[in-house]
Amino acid sequence: LTAAFVATPKTQPVASGGQMLQARQIGGVSLLTNAKGLTLYWFAPDSPNKSVCYGSCAAYWPPVAGNASAGPGVTGTIGTIKRTDGTTQATYDGHPLYTYIGDSAPGQDGGNNINLNGGLWHDVPVAGG
């Protein structure tokens, strides 16, 4: 018997405003995660402080919504951008942040180096975390 994982997109961001971002060891690397321990990602086609991930892209890669703050081990600059749909999205060193619907539990890093929705996705290493 073979089981297959099928990710179903959600229409609402899985992250909410006012959360603390943290550094977490995943696969021997210190990565940026949300307050629930889910790995955060950045999208190569985004430009500094501007997201191009909307529609079906945002369904698979929910933007980290609202304001965020830096928790222990987070050394970069946390900020926000205003998306073209009027919502606010958290950023790290100017990169808009996203979660990945394929990551269902803390410590997973399934979205790293995936070429999907028009570009390459990367996890966010945190120096010194």
Regions from the language model: what does each represent?
Residues 1-129:
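Compact beta-sheet-dominated domain cores in extracellular/mature segments
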